[in-house]
C-alpha cells in the first residue's frame, strides 16, 4: 500500500513522495531518521514552500543519544510520557523486543515489567516519477483549482480571506445565481455575497491609508455636496475603490458600479459593497459578454438614470453613447481617470460628438506625478514577483514607453539590478530616458535578447506577432498600460500554438519547436490583475476623482462647455495638502511681501497652469 503525502499545492513543484510500509530491519539502515525529522521533510498540506522545506527547530528535534543517556530513560513507562521515535528504533542490551500475538511489540525492562510499545510504521521515502504521477490526475479540473494546486493564487492574495472564501469549485456564473444581501436586496451581481465580512475587513484596512477621503467625509457631514447626484461608475473594484464609493455615498450621491477590467475585481470587496447596499455588478474572471452585461445593468435601470459618469478606460462612456445616447441630456459631466479613456474623449471632442463637459483626471498633477509614477514603481515588482518568482538582478528588460508609468517601471527595475532598455516615440521623453541612464533602442534591436518585455504606452499593437515570434525562450511579456491592445494577444490564438495555464494569470504560449513565452494577465493590466497597488498613492487619485465629481456637479451652468478640462490647480494643491499630515509635514507660509513679489495669493494657487512639475 502506498500513501501520497504531498499536498495538491506542492504537487506540481516537487517530486511526489511515496511512503511504504517496511519491516524494522529494512527501515533502519535506509532511513535512520526520527519521526520528527521525517515530518520536517514532508511539505505541510496547503502551505509553506514545497521546494525548500524547513528543518524542525532545534528545540523540537529529539536529542542524539550520548554517554549516559541511553534509551532506558526514554522508554520508561512513566505516566503521560510518550517515548521518542528515535529512541524506540535503537536496540539495547537492557531491553528486549517481544512480539504480541496480535502483531504488536512489547518492551521488556530489566525488572521483568512488560510494557506495550506504541505501534509505529517504518517509512521509507521514495521519489516517484513526477510527470507520471501528475498525469494520473483527473483531466477535468475546476476553473481555478489548477492554479491553486500549483501556487497560491497571486491574484487572490490581496487578503488572507481570499484563500478560504473564494468559491473556486463553483462553476455557476454569478449571472445565474439568486443572491440577496441581509436587507433582502438583490440589485447586484457578485461572485459570492457570503464573502462580505472578509471584504469589509479589507475596506477598513484601506481606510487607514486613505486620509484625504476620510477627511472629506468628516468635512462634508453637514453640507452633502453631492446630494441628488446619481453616479454610474466603471473602475477597478478594489478596497480603495470601495472607500471612494462609500465616501461618495457619504457626500450624498447614489452609485451604481461595474468593473473596468475583467481580472482586477476583488470578489470579497464587491460582496461587501453589495451587502452595504451598493448595486455592484462585477466579479473576477468575467467573460467579454459578462463585462458588457455588467455595464448595461448599471445603466439600464427602470426608474433610475445617471447624471454623472466616473469612468476608467472609456468603456462606460462608449456604451452609453452607443446604446443610450439620450441619457446625455441629463448627464452633467464625465470624469475620466486613464490615458486610454482620455484619448477617446479627445477623439469625441475633435469630432464634435462630445455632448457634455469632461474632466481629465489622468493628466492632473496629482494623478500623473503620484499614481502613475510611484504606484507603478512599486507595483511592477510586486506583480512580476508574484507571478514568476523571478530574480531581477542581471535580467535584461525592455520598457516600451517612458511616460510617468514607464519612468516608474524603469526606476524600480534599475534599482533591482536589471539592465533596462527603453523604446519611445517622443524625443523629449526619449531624451529624459537617456539622461536617466537608460539606453534608447528600437524594439527590434533587442527583442531576441531581453528576458522581460513591458508595455506602458496606451497605444495598440506595440508588441506584434513578429516580435513575439522572435523572442527568446521563456521571455516574460506583460502590460502596465490600461488597455489589453498593447500586446497583440489575438495573434497568438492560432492552431499551431499551444496555450498552457501554469498558475493564475500566467500562461505559457508554446511554439511548435518547443519555444515558449510567459504571458501575464493575457496582456491586461499587470499590477491590478496579478498583485495590488499602494493604498496611500491611490488615496491621492481617488480624492482627485471625488473633487472632480463635486466640481462638475456643482458648477454653474456655462462654466464648462462641451470639452475636456483639467482639474483646477487649486484643487490639485488641496488634494496634496490633505495628505501631508501623514508625514508630519509642515508647509512654509509666504509673507505678504513675498506673495506680492511673486504676484501670488498667499493661499495659492502657487504655480501657473503652464508650470510643469
Swiss-Prot record:
The keyword Protease does not apply. It comes from Mus musculus. Binds 1 NAD(+) per subunit. Disulfide bonds: none annotated. GO terms for biological process: one-carbon metabolic process. Its main location: cytoplasm. Pathway: Amino-acid biosynthesis; L-homocysteine biosynthesis; L-homocysteine from S-adenosyl-L-homocysteine: step 1/1. Residues 137-146 have a biased composition (Basic residues). This is Putative adenosylhomocysteinase 3. Belongs to the adenosylhomocysteinase family. Phosphorylated during neuronal differentiation at the LISN domain. NAD(+) binds at residues 338-340, 372, 403-408, 424, 459, 480-482, 527. Residues 2-111 are annotated as: LISN domain, inhibits interaction with ITPR1. GO terms for cellular component: cytosol; endoplasmic reticulum; intracellular membrane-bounded organelle; neuron projection. The gene is Ahcyl2. It is found in: Cytoplasm; Microsome. Substrate binds at residues 238, 312, 337, 367, 371.
Amino acid at each position: 500500500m502506498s500513501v501520497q503525502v504531498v499536498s495538491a499545492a506542492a504537487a506540481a513543484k516537487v517530486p511526489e513522495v511515496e511512503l511504504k510500509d517496511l519491516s524494522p530491519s529494512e527501515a533502519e539502515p535506509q532511513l535512520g531518521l526520527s519521526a520528527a525529522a521525517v515530518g520536517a521533510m514532508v511539505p505541510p498540506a496547503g502551505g509553506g514552500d514545497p521546494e525548500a522545506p524547513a528543518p524542525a527547530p532545534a528545540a523540537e528535534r529529539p536529542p542524539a543519544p550520548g554517554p549516559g543517556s541511553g534509551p532506558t530513560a526514554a522508554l520508561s513507562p512513566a505516566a503521560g510520557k510518550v517515548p521518542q521515535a528515535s529512541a524506540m528504533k535503537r536496540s539495547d542490551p537492557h531491553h528486549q523486543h517481544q512480539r504480541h500475538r496480535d502483531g504488536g511489540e512489547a518492551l521488556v525492562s530489566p525488572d521483568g515489567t512488560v510494557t506495550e510499545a506504541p505501534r509505529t510504521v517504518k517509512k521509507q521515502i521514495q521519489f516517484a516519477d513526477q510527470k507520471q504521477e501528475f498525469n494520473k490526475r483527473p483531466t477535468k479540473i475546476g476553473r481555478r483549482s489548477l492554479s491553486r494546486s500549483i501556487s497560491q493564487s497571486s491574484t487572490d492574495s490581496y487578503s488572507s480571506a481570499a484563500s478560504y472564501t473564494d468559491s473556486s469549485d463553483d462553476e455557476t456564473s454569478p449571472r445565474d445565481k439568486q443572491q440577496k444581501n441581509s436587507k433582502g436586496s438583490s440589485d447586484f451581481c457578485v461572485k459570492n455575497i457570503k464573502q462580505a465580512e472578509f471584504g469589509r475587513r479589507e475596506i477598513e484596512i484601506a481606510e487607514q491609508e486613505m486620509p484625504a477621503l476620510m477627511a472629506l467625509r468628516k468635512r462634508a457631514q453637514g453640507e452633502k455636496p453631492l446630494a441628488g447626484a446619481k453616479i454610474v461608475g466603471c473602475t477597478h473594484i478594489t478596497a480603495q475603490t470601495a472607500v471612494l464609493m462609500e465616501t461618495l455615498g457619504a457626500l450624498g450621491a447614489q452609485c451604481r458600479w461595474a468593473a473596468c477590467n475583467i481580472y482586477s475585481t476583488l470578489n470579497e470587496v464587491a460582496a461587501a459593497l453589495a451587502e452595504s447596499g451598493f448595486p455592484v455588478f462585477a466579479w473576477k474572471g468575467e467573460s467579454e459578454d459578462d463585462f458588457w452585461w455588467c455595464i448595461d445593468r448599471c445603466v439600464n435601470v427602470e426608474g433610475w438614470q445617471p447624471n454623472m459618469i466616473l469612468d476608467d478606460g472609456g468603456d462606460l462612456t462608449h456604451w452609453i453613447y452607443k446604446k443610450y445616447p439620450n441619457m446625455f441630456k441629463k448627464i452633467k459631466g464625465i470624469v475620466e481617470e486613464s490615458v486610454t479613456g482620455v484619448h477617446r474623449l479627445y477623439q469625441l471632442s475633435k469630432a464634435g460628438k462630445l455632448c457634455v463637459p469632461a474632466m481629465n483626471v489622468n493628466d492632473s498633477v496629482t494623478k500623473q506625478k503620484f499614481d502613475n509614477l510611484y504606484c507603478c514603481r512599486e507595483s511592477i515588482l510586486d506583480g512580476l514577483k508574484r507571478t514568476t518568482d523571478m530574480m531581477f538582478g542581471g535580467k535584461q528588460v525592455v520598457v516600451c514607453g517612458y511616460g510617468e508609468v514607464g519612468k516608474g517601471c524603469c526606476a524600480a527595475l534599475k534599482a533591482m539590478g536589471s539592465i533596462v532598455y527603453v523604446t519611445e516615440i517622443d524625443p523629449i521623453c526619449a531624451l529624459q530616458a537617456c539622461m536617466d541612464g537608460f539606453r534608447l533602442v528600437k524594439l527590434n534591436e533587442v527583442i531576441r535578447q531581453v528576458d522581460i518585455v513591458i508595455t506602458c504606452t496606451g497605444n495598440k499593437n506595440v508588441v506584434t506577432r513578429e516580435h513575439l515570434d522572435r523572442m527568446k525562450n521563456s521571455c516574460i511579456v506583460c502590460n502596465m498600460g490600461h488597455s489589453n491592445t498593447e500586446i497583440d494577444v489575438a495573434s497568438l490564438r492560432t492552431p499551431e500554438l499551444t496555450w498552457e495555464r501554469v498558475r493564475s494569470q500566467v500562461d505559457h504560449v508554446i511554439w511548435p519547436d518547443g519555444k515558449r513565452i510567459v504571458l501575464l494577465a493575457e496582456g491586461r493590466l499587470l499590477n491590478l490583475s496579478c498583485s495590488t497597488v499602494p493604498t496611500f498613492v491611490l488615496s491621492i487619485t481617488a480624492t482627485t476623482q471625488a473633487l472632480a465629481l463635486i466640481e462638475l456637479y456643482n458648477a454653474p451652468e456655462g462654466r464648462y462647455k462641451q470639452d475636456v478640462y483639467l482639474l483646477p490647480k487649486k484643487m490639485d494643491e488641496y488634494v496634496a495638502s490633505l495628505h501631508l499630515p501623514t508625514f508630519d509635514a509642515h508647509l512654509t507660509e509666504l509673507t505678504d511681501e513675498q506673495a506680492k513679489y511673486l504676484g501670488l495669493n498667499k493661499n495659492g494657487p502657487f504655480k501657473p497652469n503652464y508650470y510643469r512639475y
